[in-house]
Amino acid sequence: MASAFSKLLTGRNASLLFTTLGTSALTTGYLLNRQKVSADAREQHKLFPPSADYPDLRKHNNCMAECLTPTIYAKLRNKMTPSGYTLDQCIQTGVDNPGHPFIKTVGMVAGDEESYEVFADLFDPVIKLRHNGYDPRVMKHPTDLDASKITHGQFDERYVLSSRVRTGRSIRGLSLPPACSRAERREVENVAITALEGLKGDLAGRYYKLSEMTEQDQQRLIDDHFLFDKPVSPLLTCAGMARDWPDARGIWHNYDKTFLIWINEEDHTRVISMEKGGNMKRVFERFCRGLKEVERLIQERGWEFMWNERLGYILTCPSNLGTGLRAGVHVRIPKLSKDPRFSKILENLRLQKRGTGGVDTAAVADVYDISNIDRIGRSEVELVQIVIDGVNYLVDCEKKLERGQDIKVPPPLPQFGRK
């Protein structure tokens, strides 16, 4: 069972811990060290006005750079979350990485659940900009994991080669990867694998620690799209998520390798359902069933996932808030991908394209990774249905082009209107 003591060792529970347990050497040392770090940071900030610390964002093209102003920076610079995470730590990855040539990146991360509250003056407009107008100050996020509502979930497998649905989940009471200590990261691993040992039937499997894999085993899993890549992404390195690699990282998968859990990469956990072929309905059904069972097993052991009604499920990057869901397929569309209307068709269908191997990769043999753009403001069922309908439209366009027929750009999908 997960350690209850480690759950108490968080900033928001510090005073309660002193009262309840007294000031033992262990608790005093742990908590006073965090307080000292926070105090040192505050004193350092006092040496200079906020204007002297304001980052140079004149050549930047990310959501953080577009939303951050000197006024917001001055208001938030000296604030900290209960665990000591600062605004400058939130935005450092966006300062170090001005932008991406194909995708407008977010440019900031959260260090803990409270980051989204303490620094809401910046996070809220960034979320609204990134998520198609979703306003977390007035809107509520819907959740729906009823896979029976999905329709037309079988793709033409002459075009669709594989189907996949993933999401992330964070364990409440532990810092997120940019800010977690080694002990917290190891506790995430312990909580996750202890719960996953309870999975039965077609979900049953085993855990593989990254530190115990050979380089060859790791690369084979990466090449087969089962395992996360090595920590070379600027998001990971500049945000501090690659610290102590590969300590307490790993992958759990069922014996069929169709249900997988990544542990301690960008998020505490990434839950993935995948298989070859075009049966997205079956992939989503297994995803929903497995995710619900994982949450039940986590709760049985006294833990819970980070969630609130404004932001949905809380994850490290604001781009994944809400559902955290990315439903995608590998689809071969040689004619459509060369059509000048392709990008506009994707935009109106609320889809995005990546190369065969993901972001920053080329499309091999005209095979693209097509997935939903949105994460928040629509439920899991809605997003998967958008992908199904959209990919079917793309395949239909490809068939028309093969026959020499014209294709049309579809009208834009209606904006969500959740209160």
Swiss-Prot record:
Domain Phosphagen kinase N-terminal: 46-132
Reaction(s) this enzyme catalyzes, per UniProt: creatine + ATP = N-phosphocreatine + ADP + H(+)
Membrane topology label: Peripheral membrane protein
Signal peptide (residue range): none
Source species, domain of life: Eukaryota
GO cellular component terms, semicolon-separated: mitochondrial inner membrane; mitochondrion
Keyword Membrane: yes
GO biological process terms on file: phosphocreatine biosynthetic process; phosphocreatine metabolic process
Listed Pfam families: ATP-gua_Ptrans (PF00217), ATP-gua_PtransN (PF02807)
InterPro entries: ATP-guanido_PTrfase, ATP-guanido_PTrfase_AS, ATP-guanido_PTrfase_cat, ATP-guanido_PTrfase_N, ATP-guanido_PTrfase_N_sf, Gln_synth/guanido_kin_cat_dom
Positions bearing Phosphotyrosine: 255
Transit peptide: 1-39
Residues that bind ATP: 162-166, 225, 270, 326, 354-359, 369
Assembly and oligomerization: Exists as an octamer composed of four CKMT2 homodimers.
Role this protein plays: Reversibly catalyzes the transfer of phosphate between ATP and various phosphogens (e.g. creatine phosphate). Creatine kinase isoenzymes play a central role in energy transduction in tissues with large, fluctuating energy demands, such as skeletal muscle, heart, brain and spermatozoa.
Protein's UniProt name: Creatine kinase S-type, mitochondrial
Natural source organism: Mus musculus
